[in-house]
Amino acid sequence: MENGDIGDVILVRCYSQDPISIIEGTLEYAPRSGGQFIDMSIHDFDLIRWLTGSEVKELWATGGCYEFKQYKDWDDGDNVSGLMKMENDAMAFFFAGRAAAHGSHVETEIVGTRGTLRIASVPTDSLVEVMSQHGVCRECYQDFITRWHDAYITEIEEFCDCVATGRKATPGVIDGTQSTKIAFRCKESFLTDKKLTLE
């Protein structure tokens, strides 16, 4: 992207799905959580701002309680999605779900004027593919701790390096604040079914 190989960003698409195997813990935590937009999609909002190099101009969020109706009691959904129009006219789509049968699935796609990048379109936990009379099988990550293990270590190392060297961390406080604003506006859009500006 930095070399311009895919051209200007047209669309960023983010998927974040928790595995069904952890749904009991997710449901136990849900009443005191921030909900899908604040606890889960906020990471995609960080990515969208970074990958488009722009701020959100308008957004609309929707979703529902497709499998776990109790999310309605918490003004939330078990599956939510949304569309965003960025200030530079790029578009963004995000989806967050709580019950992926195949495991933890986090995927990003960036569509540009001259090409497309897909990151983790199949959430495999190894480079091994099993080919048999049943077809091709690739094992998927079954939990987010395993999926994000290396990222967590890198994050801690980066933080420690910033403290040790006095270097300012990026992304910074403003980035976190912006993503939080987006999350709250998405929640409001979800509850009111209205397209909103970021304000």
Residue positions per predicted region:
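Contiguous beta-strand/loop segments that form the cofactor/metal-binding neighborhood of enzyme cores
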Residues: 45-125, 153-167
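Short coil/turn segments
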Residues: 15-17, 122-124, 147-151
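C-terminal helix-rich "cap/oligomerization" subdomain common to oxidoreductases
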Residues: 87, 161-199
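A cross-taxa feature marking solvent-exposed loop/turn segments within ectodomains of secreted
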Residues: 7, 101-103, 191
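Predominantly a Rossmann-like dinucleotide-binding segment in NAD(P)-dependent oxidoreductases
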Residues: 1-74, 193
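C-terminal "lid/loop" region of Rossmann-like NAD(P)-dependent oxidoreductases
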Residues: 138-147
